[in-house]
């Protein structure tokens, strides 16, 4: 039960079922469920995320991180956090209920007009401007992580991989986010800063215009290789020049030349095309009508089992836990201990160090091979992809490359011994 220590002071002596009444389930992920609920004292509608910490042991740091970041935020553009309660191994996280669904939901009935897109992007930018002023990076900006209230207010959600800036940049080897929206410098594991969120915003802008991010027809692993290598995506089709220029500004491969969130709020696409957020209720109503007609019954996420229908027949929003690449515990930047906890944080999971063969064998060999290919006029693209595959494998399983090399050497030795034995018997 060591992994529960970090949550020891999450109101563990209070029974959350006495304080809150669970209503309809509005989302389900691998390790938790989200319910619409009522605060029994204030009668306010809330969202209740219930996570079984026994089943979610590998996600403990992400959960602590989300609680820590949300508890430090005070902005109308960030999902509000009200507190958390530990009952046995179940963690109840009480958050603001946003009944308008996600920006991804609003895309499902069909394309959005630019006025809607600009208005949503303006509110995301306000949230990013606040976060960046607090020296925080979201690191997973996408339509699924943008929630709306029933009145059309737009708020950023899902802070499980948010980072805290130290000095001006996050250190290398902090590889997090969702592949299609990930900035080139994050994939290359260079040092990066809040400009990584601006790249993700540019991809989200294309997602809002097209219904999906660029390269969505490709395998995510393939996309990780292509983003650093290819030219930045562009917004194609019959869209206004200011919209295309906005996307182009966000998707500069050199983060130094990407504008800040504050600067983008002054971009002509934002200043000319936006309306009040109450205008977005038209999209929410459109989505509810579309859903009431029987559309969208199946979950679009392989990792989510979404219960879109409320038990009383009311159309509720869909809350998802979308698949995201998380940082391994040894590379966590801002390890969030439980809020108000005076005890030691949860014991970190011991991780095997990264493979030594990466620096002593893999990189030198690939360096030699690429040099030979260049001299012969060949392309080094495939070699670069294979080399990157080693780095990606190490992120999910540190030490795997050393194990592979040991196994290969053993196989070569056995093969060599077998050949020598056959030669000597002839």
Swiss-Prot record:
Residues 299-314 have a biased composition (Acidic residues). Keywords: ATP-binding, Cytoplasm, Golgi apparatus, Kinase, Magnesium, Metal-binding, Nucleotide-binding, Phosphoprotein, Serine/threonine-protein kinase, Transferase. Its cofactor is Mg(2+). Interaction with Golgi matrix protein GOLGA2 leads to autophosphorylation on Thr-174, possibly as a consequence of stabilization of dimer formation. The C-terminal non-catalytic region inhibits the kinase activity. ATP binds at residues 26-34, 49. PANTHER family: SERINE_THREONINE-PROTEIN KINASE 25, STERILE20-LIKE KINASE, ISOFORM B-RELATED. This is Serine/threonine-protein kinase 25. It comes from Mus musculus (Mouse). The gene is Stk25.
């Amino acid at each position: 039960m060591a992994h529960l220590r970090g949550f020891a002071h999450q109101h563990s002596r209070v029974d959350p079922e006495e304080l809150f009444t669970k209503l309809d389930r509005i989302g389900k992920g691998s390790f938790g469920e989200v319910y619409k609920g009522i605060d029994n004292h204030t009668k306010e509608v809330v969202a209740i995320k219930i996570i079984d910490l026994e089943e979610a042991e590998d996600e403990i740091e992400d959960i602590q991180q989300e609680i820590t970041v949300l508890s430090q935020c005070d902005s109308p553009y960030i999902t509000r956090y009200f507190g958390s309660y530990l009952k046995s191994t179940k963690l109840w996280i009480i958050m603001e209920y946003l009944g308008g669904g996600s920006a991804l939901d609003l895309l499902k009935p069909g394309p959005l007009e630019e006025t809607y897109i600009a208005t949503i992007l303006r509110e995301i930018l306000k949230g990013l401007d606040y976060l960046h002023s607090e020296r925080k990076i979201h690191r997973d900006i996408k339509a699924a992580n943008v929630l709306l209230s029933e009145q059309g207010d737009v708020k950023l959600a899902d802070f499980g991989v948010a980072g805290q800036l130290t000095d001006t940049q996050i250190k290398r080897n902090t590889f997090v986010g969702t592949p299609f929206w990930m900035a080139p410098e994050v994939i290359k594991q260079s040092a990066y800063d809040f400009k990584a969120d601006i790249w993700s915003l540019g991809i989200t802008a294309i997602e809002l215009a097209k219904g999906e991010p660029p390269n969505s027809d490709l395998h995510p692993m393939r996309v990780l290789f292509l983003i650093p290598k290819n030219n930045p995506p562009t917004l194609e089709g019959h869209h206004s020049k200011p919209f295309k220029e906005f996307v182009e500004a966000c998707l500069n491969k050199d983060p130094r030349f990407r504008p800040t969130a504050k600067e983008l709020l002054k971009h002509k696409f934002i200043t000319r095309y936006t309306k009040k957020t109450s205008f977005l209720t038209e999209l929410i109503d459109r989505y509810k009508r579309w859903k009431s007609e029987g559309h969208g019954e199946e979950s679009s996420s392989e990792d989510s089992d979404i219960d879109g229908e409320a038990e009383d027949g009311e159309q509720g929003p869909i809350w998802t836990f979308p698949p995201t690449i998380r940082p391994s515990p040894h590379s966590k930047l801002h390890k969030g201990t439980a809020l108000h906890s005076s005890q030691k944080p949860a014991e970190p999971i011991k991780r095997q160090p990264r493979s030594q063969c990466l620096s002593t064998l893999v990189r030198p060999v690939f360096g030699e091979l690429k040099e030979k290919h260049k001299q012969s006029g060949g392309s080094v693209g495939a070699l670069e992809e294979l080399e990157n595959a080693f780095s990606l494998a190490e992120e999910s399983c540190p030490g795997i490359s050393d194990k592979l090399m040991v196994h290969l050497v053993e196989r070569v030795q056995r093969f060599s011994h077998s050949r020598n034995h056959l030669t000597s018997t002839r």
